[in-house]
């Protein structure tokens, strides 16, 4: 199951704009770019542990919500239930995109993971952690802090991985362009030599 083409193209364009290294003037020829793996082991390990931590976070959040539900004002009841539902839905999508983007080195999926983490998950969990009106219990604070640490680490490591992936793709493009130009120059030389012989 892959992202629809318009979404992939927009995320690809976004990631090329944000993550490409503008200081580079040309491709680097240090290593063979076709053989280099750019997926991040640290990000993958974080995603792996996050998949096991998230059910624990969810169960503890539901239990703590049930314990303090009667003392919360009505608007906080609605807000907290909505946030937990949103975090649950977003987390499933986010982890899927993170796995696909990192393991298969797909830039649009990893960019989607990064955007969901930075723009949706992190603000929601920070709201749950720092809002004084929610009267957070100690277990709740502990699991929110751990989840925030996971998210912060994943945002930073996904950014670095995306930057590396985009630079590798740019290098591949420049090398293919160079090879194509070299081949066309060779063809032109052959045509010139044939014309000169005639």
Curated annotation (Swiss-Prot):
GO biological process: cilium assembly; non-motile cilium assembly; smoothened signaling pathway
Domain of life: Eukaryota
Membrane topology: Multi-pass membrane protein
InterPro entries given in the database record: Uncharacterised_TM-17
List of glycosylated residues: 13, 23
Swiss-Prot/TrEMBL keywords: Cell membrane, Cell projection, Cilium, Cilium biogenesis/degradation, Glycoprotein, Membrane, Transmembrane, Transmembrane helix
Coiled-coil segments: none
Cellular compartments annotated: Cell projection, Cilium membrane
Transmembrane segments: 45-65, 78-98, 110-130, 142-162
Main location (coarse class): membrane
GO cellular component terms given for this protein: ciliary membrane; ciliary transition zone; MKS complex
UniProt similarity note: Belongs to the TMEM17 family.
Reported function: Transmembrane component of the tectonic-like complex, a complex localized at the transition zone of primary cilia and acting as a barrier that prevents diffusion of transmembrane proteins between the cilia and plasma membranes. Required for ciliogenesis and sonic hedgehog/SHH signaling.
Quaternary structure and partners: Part of the tectonic-like complex (also named B9 complex).
Protein name: Transmembrane protein 17
Native organism: Bos taurus (Bovine)
Chain's gene name: TMEM17
């Amino acid at each position: 199951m892959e992202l629809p083409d318009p979404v992939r193209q927009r995320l690809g364009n976004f990631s090329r704009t944000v993550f490409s290294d503008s200081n580079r003037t040309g491709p680097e020829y240090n290593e063979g770019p076709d053989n280099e793996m750019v997926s991040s082991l640290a990000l993958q390990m974080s995603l792996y542990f996050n998949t096991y931590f998230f059910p624990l976070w969810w169960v503890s959040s539901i239990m703590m919500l049930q314990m303090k539900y009667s003392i919360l004002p009505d608007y906080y009841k609605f807000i907290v239930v909505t946030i937990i539902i949103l975090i649950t839905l977003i987390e499933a999508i986010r982890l899927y995109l993170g796995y696909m983007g990192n393991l298969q080195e797909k830039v649009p999926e990893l960019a989607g993971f990064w955007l969901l983490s930075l723009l949706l998950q992190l603000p929601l969990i920070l709201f749950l952690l720092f809002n004084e009106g929610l009267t957070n219990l100690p277990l709740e604070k502990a699991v929110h802090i751990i989840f925030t640490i996971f998210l912060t680490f994943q945002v930073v490591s996904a950014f670095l991985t995306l930057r590396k992936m985009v630079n590798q793709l740019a290098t591949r493009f420049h090398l293919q362009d160079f090879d194509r130009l070299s081949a066309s120059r060779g063809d032109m030389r052959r045509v010139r030599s044939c014309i000169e012989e005639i």
